[in-house]
Amino acid sequence: MASISEPVTFREFCPLYYLLNAIPTKIQKGFRSIVVYLTALDTNGDYIAVGSSIGMLYLYCRHLNQMRKYNFEGKTESITVVKLLSCFDDLVAAGTASGRVAVFQLVSSLPGRNKQLRRFDVTGIHKNSITALAWSPNGMKLFSGDDKGKIVYSSLDLDQGLCNSQLVLEEPSSIVQLDYSQKVLLVSTLQRSLLFYTEEKSVRQIGTQPRKSTGKFGACFIPGLCKQSDLTLYASRPGLRLWKADVHGTVQATFILKDAFAGGVKPFELHPRLESPNSGSCSLPERHLGLVSCFFQEGWVLSWNEYSIYLLDTVNQATVAGLEGSGDIVSVSCTENEIFFLKGDRNIIRISSRPEGLTSTVRDGLEMSGCSERVHVQQAEKLPGATVSETRLRGSSMASSVASEPRSRSSSLNSTDSGSGLLPPGLQATPELGKGSQPLSQRFNAISSEDFDQELVVKPIKVKRKKKKKKTEGGSRSTCHSSLESTPCSEFPGDSPQSLNTDLLSMTSSVLGSSVDQLSAESPDQESSFNGEVNGVPQENTDPETFNVLEVSGSMPDSLAEEDDIRTEMPHCHHAHGRELLNGAREDVGGSDVTGLGDEPCPADDGPNSTQLPFQEQDSSPGAHDGEDIQPIGPQSTFCEVPLLNSLTVPSSLSWAPSAEQWLPGTRADEGSPVEPSQEQDILTSMEASGHLSTNLWHAVTDDDTGQKEIPISERVLGSVGGQLTPVSALAASTHKPWLEQPPRDQTLTSSDEEDIYAHGLPSSSSETSVTELGPSCSQQDLSRLGAEDAGLLKPDQFAESWMGYSGPGYGILSLVVSEKYIWCLDYKGGLFCSALPGAGLRWQKFEDAVQQVAVSPSGALLWKIEQKSNRAFACGKVTIKGKRHWYEALPQAVFVALSDDTAWIIRTSGDLYLQTGLSVDRPCARAVKVDCPYPLSQITARNNVVWALTEQRALLYREGVSSFCPEGEQWKCDIVSERQALEPVCITLGDQQTLWALDIHGNLWFRTGIISKKPQGDDDHWWQVSITDYVVFDQCSLFQTIIHATHSVATAAQAPVEKVADKLRMAFWSQQLQCQPSLLGVNNSGVWISSGKNEFHVAKGSLIGTYWNHVVPRGTASATKWAFVLASAAPTKEGSFLWLCQSSKDLCSVSAQSAQSRPSTVQLPPEAEMRAYAACQDALWALDSLGQVFIRTLSKSCPTGMHWTRLDLSQLGAVKLTSLACGNQHIWACDSRGGVYFRVGTQPLNPSLMLPAWIMIEPPVQPAGVSLVSVHSSPNDQMLWVLDSRWNVHVRTGITEEMPVGTAWEHVPGLQACQLALSTRTVWARCPNGDLARRYGVTDKNPAGDYWKKIPGSVSCFTVTASDELWAVGPPGYLLQRLTKTFSHSHGTQKSSQAAMPHPEDLEDEWEVI
């Protein structure tokens, strides 16, 4: 323990947003939304372990800044206690409310350590809630106690994978605390404290005096190196007394602490919060001690109960500090100098003598003024990031308009914990905000759309030195995890202070891909929560002795959090020796396979072309992800959907071009020499597709007085979700070569990485912005190396379905409408807000009050509102955002209005429909004419002489004969397509590009195309479904609860549990007509906008892929034929694919995939054989029967279904029974009943007189006991092998090359559980146990595991994929289905890209929007 000479103050330095944001507040289970409560806590120097009410254990690695998740299989039950142990292997034990105890042996990247997550279960002895756990120091013994007094001893043999448990002691009352040392177990119960000698199995009570009252009084050993006979302990007693006793239970001293408490207890300083932690504090109960632990220095004892925490000094018999009357303290844990406690449902607070992550030496170094030497930080513990007291705020003005932060999401399967704010602890520090404390609303910096459209000339800037700002009291350091700190504006040369176009929102720069917030291997539920908010911004720091802090509590890129430094410097900067870490974050990831650079200290002087930028590479250490749900903090987990500016690849293949070398340890360019773009890919070419340079964050990387370096960090980082997207903030990627510019207009940068959407270059913008000051330019030759064939990789589907999230203006959103330039939101309280589009972020302005419905015309010229209570419709005279507005009464008794650019369609309270025509800016309303309608309507939408309506029964109608000459049209027609698909829309809207959009009651989004006035029903004979459920959770009950809260109409509902109220109201919302129809969908030329009814909405600004599963009936078969199996293979005859179909295990037929409706050919099976599995390639069909026999049918052009079956001689394999087969092009893979994997070259059964090809046995992946491989899946080109195990975990074989066709190692692929896989030549598709389908993105030769999963619409019972990624499936009723897709793009320009081999840069221009 530390010996302390001067007095120390214990306080909370900064809230643990990085930890709390990584744990979802709710999960979705089916239709139910379950609140996640935190229930248990334990900490040490390496990890923070948090138990939850859903049976999920969250483990945060403090060195890697990664959150992992582990769960108990079976029913979800609350975790009541967790206990960490760091010995040779890291272990964590958790106990639940039903008496289950599980031990997880964690994966370590260090050599010789555990490489596979393992779990041991203690079951069958405890039947009641676990209350205490204790480890032996070597991790071989675990003691667990429950609330009925049972104590179980579990012996762990980690090498053998064994865990044996036995009951060793039973007390009459609940166990309160356990501690173990030197073969002695210290037990505290509600009635007494005792010592249990584990060798002699004898018990001795501590002290002879019985307790005067029962209670949760604990005891702990006093740490120290000593033999058993010298052990001493503290035990708390009623009446503020503490015993010190020896190993025989004899009391050596009694500390009576009443006098120490008489003068009061100095409270711990807590970080200021919006709601004080003591809000809801209880009246102070009688003081008493509780559980105890030794802490900080000799003689100091930490004691706590559910109301209070006390830090006591037994030497001086005094209280050091404490927290009293707070109430609801659930769990307390301490490390050497930190106290963590869990309060209430989800508040974890850290109390310490110093900020998180700073060792005292680093702290002292930071405080030295004028220190010009670079601080060498080489260990992970040294500096996860500078904290508050070390951060000086530089910069100038702060604008004070509220901005809502975009948080991007993209479709992916992994909707777990998505937007976790995983920052290194230090990076969470709140910068001190100048003089005086400002209200939160003023701590925002936003840009108006006018600013955003200005030209931005980028130059390196010198920042004037300013004196350190003194720390101010109170709120200046307080921050709330949903707020944004202000961005300092840098002054431009010439002293004209201009705001850099850095909307704070951009800080949360959207990660538009899919978080690989992976579901853990056994995760029973998909947790969907999105908490990432921005906590701050980079501060420009000019003092050489201080560190810059980039503070973002959205999911921060691992790049900033945990990796080694790529160096870069802007031109025109003097070179200097002293250098500091850009973000103050430098983590040494010890021993991990890819991150070797961390092991060598960086030279202090790297030549003029280097500046440090941390950057993260995918950790590909084998087994590093096995069975664990690792959520890297940032891009590696949030794989984007959109190319970063100029090809930012974050996963393992960090490549710019086909010739790029992978940036692995050691492949570093010579220090100081310029690096060709093909060698280093992390270059941000700053540009924006909508016609101006993207916003740049200027990070000052300070030198000593000789100069100042500036690095523009573009925030267009994409990524996102896992279903929930994680915002990656200001991903500071850059290159050795000092340049930052746009590529030539006629080139598009692409990458050899086919699937990784990081790898695609963004076409350059049409901006005329000068780039002359940006330094040396990239030559044409560099770009011309990029092969034209790679341009075809810019397929829209890779960038499709990238959703960004925005915060709404206040309360839940009832209605959302968009025009060309503005978005309008109506909340449940009747507040109407608007914000300009598509600036860097949304700046909400209150427009009106007491509004029930709002409508706007597509151009934005017309704006109508319907008033609350009076139901009168008003038209706005001239739509101005600022200044006075005049409203004209347009029609009384209205409930819903839809506006086209020159008409208004009004549904009235009577259900009648009225029309006003000839409207314009000068004539916003006119005389109303009644239009007959056969059904009462609830919604209507009109645009470009097309009118669609939604009836109260959720049927869709369209109006025929509408034209500019006949605006009222001729007649209503029912939409047959919607009836056929049984679509039940909640709201509909007409969008640009002649589209119609609908949101249904299940939260699915659909569209139709070709909607024009002459053909209002459109071109499609079905709706196309767009995948949104991974980011937008339509929680009807929360939608209705929002209405309740807003209108205060159910005052007594709160007395019942929220879930019950929600259940009662769930149907009420969708079945009864609300006073106003929620309108949750809007489409304009900048994107598709959706609200889920909460105070948030989502926008897809790129293309969207619509899916339709087409029911195919081969000729000669009945439409009701129930197929059981479908398999696609390369056709023996010509280009294209064959489908092999069967209805049972005793039949088989084949048909060409190109003409699947033609008559199938029947294939005769071997007599008496019951087939269990098939695999096929171009020249052979392999079949496996129920006895494990293999039959081969040779296929040829002349006989595409083959002539006869040949039984394969399997005598070489002995008694092995094969259960799964996979055919590549020339290679065969098989799996046996015990999980063994076999490889064979050649698809044909050779003549038995010749040498038979040998089966080579491949060692399967290391698995926990009882888990084995069950199926193998190979790609048609022999390049990939993926396997599934008996727990539905997915693994990939790495290292497969032409020279090494069997590969070299196995890697667990986290993110989802799959019961079937199908491989094309480029990627992998998976079917989940519930029938959902997902695609793996980012699979390449260099990155065989890919990056993230992304779900597609549909639910199937069996599926297959052709070599070219066309999906075929058997649907739930047994129908044969073919997946058809249609891409919706916002501009005609994007559609040209699929026709040209080398698309012009502007073709994809509107795909991207800088947020």
From Swiss-Prot:
Tissues of expression: Detected in skin fibroblast (at protein level).
UniProtKB keywords: Autophagy, Hereditary spastic paraplegia, Neurodegeneration, Neuropathy, Repeat, WD repeat
Subunit composition and interactions: Interacts with the ATG8 family members GABARAP, GABARAPL1, GABARAPL2, MAP1LC3B and MAP1LC3C.
Disease tied to this entry: Neuropathy, hereditary sensory and autonomic, 9, with developmental delay: A form of hereditary sensory and autonomic neuropathy, a genetically and clinically heterogeneous group of disorders characterized by degeneration of dorsal root and autonomic ganglion cells, and by sensory and/or autonomic abnormalities. HSAN9 is characterized by global developmental delay and intellectual disability, axial and appendicular hypotonia, dysarthria, and an abnormal gait that is often described as ataxic. Other features may include peripheral neuropathy, hyporeflexia, and autonomic dysfunction.
Ranges of compositional bias, category Polar residues: 475-489, 496-542, 608-621, 763-779
Domain of life: Eukaryota
Name listed for the protein in its UniProt record: Tectonin beta-propeller repeat-containing protein 2
One GO term (biological process): autophagy
Family statement drawn from the similarity comment of this UniProt entry: Belongs to the WD repeat KIAA0329 family.
Annotated function: Probably plays a role as positive regulator of autophagy.
Species: Homo sapiens (Human)
Region (Disordered): 379-439, 463-542, 579-637, 758-779, 1388-1411
Biased composition (Low complexity): 400-420
WD repeat residue numbers: 23-66, 67-114, 115-161, 162-203, 204-265, 266-309, 310-343
TECPR repeat copies, ranges: 945-976, 994-1027, 1179-1209, 1226-1259, 1279-1310, 1322-1353
Pfam families: Beta-prop_HPS5, Hyd_WA, Tectonin
Gene3D superfamilies, sorted: YVTN repeat-like/Quinoprotein amine dehydrogenase
Gene for this chain: TECPR2
GO cellular component, one term: cytoplasm
Tagged with keyword Protein transport: no
Statement: the UniProt record of this protein carries the keyword DNA-binding: no
InterPro entries: Beta-prop_HPS5-like, Beta-propeller_rpt_TECPR, RCC1/BLIP-II, WD40/YVTN_repeat-like_dom_sf, WD40_repeat_dom_sf, WD40_rpt
